[in-house]
Amino acid sequence: MLQTTILWTHAVAGAIWIGACACFAIAGLALGAGSPEQRNFVAKSASKIDALGLVAAAVLLATGLTGLTVVTALHGFAFSTAFMTVLAIKIGLFVVMLVAMTWSMRVGAAVRAAIAREHTGAAAAAMPQMVKAHVAVVAMGAVALILGTWLMGS
């Protein structure tokens, strides 16, 4: 029962992180460059969406480590090379996803500061890079979720 709860919490946290990043990317693409809506999105909503993604990433890390500890105890440290390879890929993806997300969050903070100083073009200049970072997180997260289904079966 514990292992199932950990696994589902892990999967839901991953889905929330990917979903939050997908929402950010969709909103970023839908809003007109330099529009008041885009500035308002960056100034008021983007950090909240990113905070949700970051909390989900923290839960993902915690449940991943807990799940690995449980599985390790059950298998006595005896994992196949394929399992270890897939696990290493998932860990690598997580690290790169976290780097992309935190970079975008730093850019967002700088843009919010620029908007507060009445620099109206800041959001339009930064949004394409922020959207690309979130799309990258979505793509890598989708791969990680697919790899996770493989790990469940092994």
Identify the residue ranges that each predicted region occupies.
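Polytopic transmembrane helical bundles with strong interfacial aromatic enrichment
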Residues: 1-154
